Every structure is written in C-alpha cells, then in structure tokens.
Amino acid sequence: MKRSDINTLIRSATKCFESHGWTLPPHPRWDVTDFGLGCHRRYGLVLINLATEPEYCEKLMYGWREMTTPAHTHAKKKEDIICRWGELKIVLW
C-alpha cells in the first residue's frame, strides 16, 4: 500500500472519529492494513491501538461501506467488538 493511501485513510478515520465526538489519544498508534491483498478499498481496516496486552487488546477501528475484514484468528486473545456508529455484520462459522 502506498504511503499516500495510508495517509488518506488516517485522515478519513480521524475526521470520522472527531465528527462523532471521540477524543483520540495525543499520539495515536495507527495500524492501516489491506491484509496483504492489495485492495485496501475492498479489504482493509484502519485501527488505533488503545491497549495491547498478551491476552487482551483494545482498538478503535474504522471501516467503510462494503469493506470486508477477512477471517482471521488470534491465539488466546480476547476482543470486544462494539459498533459505535453505522452497521456491523459478523459472519461466524
């Protein structure tokens, strides 16, 4: 993914978070990924790491309409997924 794409996605996420009144940490730890698939508009995610521990993580996640997060696993890690705005569809199998 190009650095310009990463910067655009971070700006878009920041604008969304701020427009909904969510205060970001002073120096956010951003993760921007296309999951190695080369198509960040379809498969991507923008995250701010708020807490990272061996068995727990807390992240503020930003996605967009029609965006898919591919199936993945975490060995012994708890995640709470809370949709603060918009709609979230989770498929389990």
Predicted regions and their residues:
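A short, N-terminal "cap"/entry segment at the start of jelly-roll beta-barrel domains
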Residues: 1-56
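Short histidine-centered beta-strand/loop micro-motifs
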Residues: 48-52, 59-61, 69-74, 82
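Glycine- and acidic-residue-biased ligand/ion/polar-headgroup-sensing regions
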Residues: 64-65, 76-93
